[in-house]
């Protein structure tokens, strides 16, 4: 049994009796299994257009998909008693509206063996949950949000993970999360698989474990500490410190990753950090950020949003080996100008200094190419790139379609050959309408 699982086991042993003791002293009132339940159906209409200005890895110059999705989420309440029981469930249906054989591959829809977008796909899942005092234990398929493992929601369907999650608030100003996950459902898949994939890793056994805490979440000064372990691949540690005060937000993030066990991705010794400062004055927000990757391999992660560094943005993560990047961002809330619900954002990130030629030979970031008889690093020496994002989002404030949102996003990314990324112009149009049925 590895060290992180021992830590996780000790957490459960310690947490369970303390929670039971607290509950026996003053059990939380429960609304009931059905009385505390809620149901929501999110309608998501998604158009994604990729215009490649240089040859893409797939050989396509242009990909485009338009699809309609329906995401149903049910959350039950808990039964009464010292230990309450409940269930959460979710379902998804995605339907193709427009695409073709030459235009598939945006990630909105699955692709069949002939390279065509499938007409539709669906999935479902759920989790059993137990609550005692201020601690909840869930087992099954769910979304996860932590800095070391975070399922993304960037396309038509959210990502899901299957496993065990403990969520505890027994101590004031401390939100503890611990988990063990063994399967993952990608954004364009109907079923979960027992593999976790990143930039240079693919592990099919054991899964991922983590434990950590968010500290002083509702106070001006807060932070977080987490540790995770990807089976036979790496151990990763994360720390955060942030300050919110009078229109100023300062945020610092740090990751350290070392290879572990069988080291299936090769040797890894990587430290990544970012520093961001935001100033808000009325309707205007101004942000500057700096990010640095120290190590011969990229900063890698599994789970689509498991990177809380400041310069991980719409298209690129700016996480190449030895890469340094900076960001300038501007936000405008047009509610102050008579259009409540309308927000605008633009940002620019520039990264350079990438050198992937020192990645360990034979590892996931510098594999051996049998056809050429040479090692081929993912990135060369002198890599550089930049990205510019423009977002416009409007949320209806009243009327029959209240809470419906329309988002228009445009992304431009340019890179040299050593960076290895695409020269791409990308357009997103996303329309969402949540139907909330409240509590039963």
Regions from the PLM with identified roles:
Residues 74-105, 114-193, 215-217, 221, ...:
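Outer membrane beta-barrel
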Residues 20-140, 332, 390-397, 405-440:
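Beta-barrel outer-membrane channel/assembly domains of diderm bacteria
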Residues 95, 174-199, 246-325, 417-422:
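Outer-membrane beta-barrel translocator/channel fold
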Residues 151-158, 183-187, 203-205, 227-238, ...:
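Solvent-exposed loop/turn segments connecting transmembrane beta-strands
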Residues 81-85, 134-138, 173-177, 185, ...:
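Repeated loop/turn-to-beta-strand initiation elements of outer-membrane beta-barrel proteins
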Residues 45-47, 137-151, 176-178, 211, ...:
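Transmembrane beta-strand segments that form the barrel wall of outer-membrane beta-barrel proteins
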Residues 301-393, 397:
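C-terminal structural cap/anchor segments
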Residues 35, 64-70, 120-124, 158-162, ...:
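Residues that define the transmembrane beta-barrel architecture of outer-membrane proteins
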């Amino acid at each position: 049994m590895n060290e992180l699982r021992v830590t996780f086991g000790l957490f459960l042993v310690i947490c369970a009796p303390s929670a039971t003791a607290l509950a026996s002293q003053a059990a939380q009132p429960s609304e009931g299994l059905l009385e505390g339940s809620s149901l929501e159906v999110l309608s998501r209409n998604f158009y994604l257009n990729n215009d490649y200005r240089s040859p893409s890895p797939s050989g396509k110059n242009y990909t485009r998909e338009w699809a309609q999705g329906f995401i149903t989420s049910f959350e039950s309440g808990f039964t009464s008693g010292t230990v309450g029981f409940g269930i959460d469930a979710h379902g998804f249906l995605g339907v193709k509206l427009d695409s073709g054989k030459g235009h598939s591959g945006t990630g909105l829809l699955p692709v069949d063996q002939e390279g065509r977008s499938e007409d539709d796909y669906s999935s479902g899942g759920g989790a059993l949950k137990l609550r005692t005092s201020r601690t909840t234990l869930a087992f099954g398929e769910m979304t996860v949000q932590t800095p070391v493992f975070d399922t993304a929601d960037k396309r038509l369907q959210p990502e899901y993970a299957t496993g065990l999650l403990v969520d505890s608030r027994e101590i004031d100003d401390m939100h503890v999360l611990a988990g063990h996950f063994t399967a993952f459902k990608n954004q364009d898949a109907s079923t979960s698989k027992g593999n976790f994939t990143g930039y240079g890793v693919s592990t099919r056994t054991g899964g991922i474990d983590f434990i950590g805490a968010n500290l002083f979440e509702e106070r001006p000064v807060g932070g977080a500490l987490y540790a995770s372990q990807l089976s036979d691949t790496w151990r990763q540690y994360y720390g955060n410190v942030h300050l919110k005060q009078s229109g100023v937000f300062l945020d610092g993030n740090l990751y350290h990753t070392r290879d572990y066990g069988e080291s299936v991705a090769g040797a890894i010794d990587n430290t990544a950090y970012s520093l961001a400062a935001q100033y808000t004055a009325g309707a205007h927000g101004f942000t500057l950020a700096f990010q640095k990757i120290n190590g011969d391999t990229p900063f890698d992660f599994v789970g689509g949003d498991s990177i809380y560094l400041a310069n991980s943005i719409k298209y690129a993560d700016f996480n190449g080996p030895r890469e340094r990047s900076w960001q300038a961002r501007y936000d405008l809330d047009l509610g102050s100008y008579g259009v409540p619900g309308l927000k605008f954002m633009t940002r620019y990130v520039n990264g350079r200094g990438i050198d992937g030629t020192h990645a360990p030979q034979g590892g996931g970031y510098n594999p051996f190419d049998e056809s050429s008889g040479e090692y081929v690093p993912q990135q060369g020496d002198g890599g550089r790139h930049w990205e510019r994002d423009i977002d416009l989002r409007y949320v209806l404030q009243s009327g029959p379609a209240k809470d419906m949102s329309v988002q228009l996003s445009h992304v431009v990314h340019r890179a040299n050959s050593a960076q290895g990324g695409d020269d791409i112009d990308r357009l997103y149009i996303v329309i969402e309408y949540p139907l909330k049925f409240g509590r039963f």
